[in-house]
Amino acid sequence: MSRLRIAFMGTPAYGAASLQALVDAGYQVCGVFTQPDRPRGRRGKTQPPPVKLLAQQHGIPVYQPARISRDGVDDFRRLQPDLAVTAAFGQILSQELLDIPRLGTVNVHASLLPKYRGSSPVHWAIMEGETKTGVTTMMTDAGIDTGDILLQSTLNVLPGETAGELTLRLADLGAKVLLETVEALEHGHCPRRPQEEGLMSHYPMLRKEMGEINWSGSAEQIARSLRGMLPWPG
């Protein structure tokens, strides 16, 4: 088992894949930070995030601050992590928090940065008609998906693939790339390179009202919108 202490931050199933990979690889996940339980589904029943459920299965301490940079810094510091990992956490990290892990914070982002920065990269890649996408591990800084790139891996977008289906494949790919990244960082041989700002694209977070399809578009545009909005907010 590695002696590396890792604090993990993530919320949906995409993040759970990376957490499971770290546990299976024998890393010491000293704590998990995830979003608070929230109402979900048509009945609005309060449900825990997938990352929380997985952490509890493995007996890992769980923290659910509404804003980690305001309410979770002390808990985070007490864990004394060597490294932090984020995967679809859903919160912005303060510089105070980023300065705590001696090896920094690695983010597992579901696009080939610097393209598709932001919180909904999979959906937008499909809606923009991309035929290839991938995952990037990057060193988190105070910006939004602006840190140095560590490793990347690509995959093809399958014909007719929805955002939900593609997210599952990217989650598995991201978990594999994360393990390669953590191992390289642990042994001090993980090169990093700055993002090329000239190639940057940033897309907004999806909102429920975006699920309304513009039927005046071409057949291809409508099909891409439908695929990109499934399973939510379509």
Task: Name each model feature, range by range.
Residues 28, 59-61, 104:
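Conserved beta-strand segments of alpha/beta enzyme cores
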Residues 25, 35, 83-202:
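Donor/substrate-binding cores of folate-linked one-carbon enzymes
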Residues 11-14, 66-69, 89-91:
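Short beta->alpha connector loops
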Residues 2, 197-234:
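Internal anion-binding site segments
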Residues 16, 20-24, 73-77, 179:
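Amphipathic, non-transmembrane alpha-helical secondary structure
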Residues 1-43:
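N-terminal Rossmann-like dinucleotide-binding module
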Residues 35, 39-82:
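N-terminal glycine-/serine-/threonine-rich beta1-alpha1-beta2 phosphate-ribose binding loop
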